Swiss-Prot record:
Gene giving rise to this polypeptide: TRX2
GO cellular component, one term: host cell nucleus
Protein name: Triplex capsid protein 2
Recorded GO MF terms: structural molecule activity
Species classification: Viruses, Duplodnaviria, Heunggongvirae, Peploviricota, Herviviricetes
Binding partners and assembly: Interacts with TRX1 and major capisd protein/MCP.
Keyword entries, A-Z: Capsid protein, Host nucleus, Virion
Subcellular localization: Virion; Host nucleus
Length: 314
């Protein structure tokens, strides 16, 4: 017999107004991310203020990292005193589990769905004025489109750093399921979208630059293995750019170990770069949470509609 679903009671404040409660009831099927996996939690554990770091609001990269670190759950029911959410990844989903499409793309039967912060002009934020809280719901996006969307955003942000850069025709258009979507982020003003793109680009450029410098410092040492390693010898004989770099750029020899047993600095730098690049890839790569599974009815779910889901097999 299958184990029961892990349901979480998100307790609502007693002074929540009827209007705010009615707005919350329209959020059934949306995703929230919990700071801790408990049977009963407070509303403050899923509000926007829970993502703040040292009192500063989060940018998109920190939200992506939080989505990977926290525990995802789907709001199944909203009652006068609590919201009942089903946790993902710890137990089977309850029968009839569903999600609400909050992203810009249509969801199709069989799509693996991941969560993204609002990186475009599409934002799903609910303000509860009676208790002074805000809930920022993530965008539900198919996995392939989420990765392409992040790649396009980073490419546009890099292009915007070039003075007098002109956007290429069709660079901000995505096609999915027979429809055309305009994915134009506003990179001209220092608003939330601009800050998001800049933080993402700076982290990526830093990782690529550090990795290139570390590998460049190792090239002369690698080329000395040409007489012993057939693969390296083949690269040298090809007269490639790698060979030119090894001949023209004379790096300083690797220093002796510091403090006795300490490792070489260049290898420490390489290790740190691999760690940073791997972590950045995990954050921006997207993680499938659920999979759309419709047995009857329409196979395409538009924004604001609900769709039955099953757990992903990843």
């Amino acid at each position: 017999m299958a184990s029961a679903a892990f349901e979480i009671d998100i307790l609502l404040p007693s002074d929540l107004s009827p209007a705010d409660l009615s707005a919350l009831q329209k959020c059934e099927g949306k995703l929230v991310f919990l700071t801790a996996l408990r049977r009963r939690v407070m509303l403050s554990s899923v509000t926007l203020s829970s993502y703040y770091v040292n009192g500063a609001p989060p940018d998109t990269l920190s939200l992506m990292a939080a989505f990977r670190r926290r525990f995802p759950a789907i709001i199944q029911r909203v009652l006068p005193n609590k919201m009942i959410a089903a946790a993902l990844g710890v137990a089977p989903l309850p029968p009839g589990a569903f999600i609400q499409n909050t992203g810009p793309f249509d969801l199709c039967n069989g799509d693996s769905v991941c969560a993204l912060p609002p990186i475009l002009d599409v934002e799903d934020k609910l303000r509860l004025g009676s208790v002074g809280e805000e809930i920022l719901f993530p965008l539900t996006v198919p996995l392939a489109q989420a990765r392409e969307l992040i790649a396009r955003l980073v490419a546009r942000a890099v292009q915007a750093l070039t003075p007098n850069a002109q956007a290429q025709r069709g660079a901000e258009v995505m096609f999915y399921n027979g429809r055309k979507y305009n994915v134009t982020p506003d990179l001209r003003h220092r608003d939330a979208v601009n800050g998001v793109a800049r933080s993402l680009v700076l982290n990526m450029i830093f990782a690529m630059n550090e990795g290139s410098l570390v590998l460049l410092s190792l090239i002369p040492n690698l080329l000395t293995l040409g007489t012993q390693d057939g693969f390296v010898n083949a690269i040298i004989q090809m007269g490639s750019a790698t060979r030119e770099v090894g001949q023209l750029v004379h790096q300083q020899p690797v220093p002796q170990p510091q403090d006795g047993a300490r490792r070489f600095c260049v290898y420490d730098a390489l290790m740190s770069w691999i760690s940073v690049a791997s972590r950045l890839g995990d954050v921006v790569g997207g993680k499938p949470l659920v999979r759309i599974c419709t047995f009857e009815g329409q196979a395409t779910i538009s924004r604001g509609e609900k769709a039955p889901v099953i757990q992903t097999l990843l």
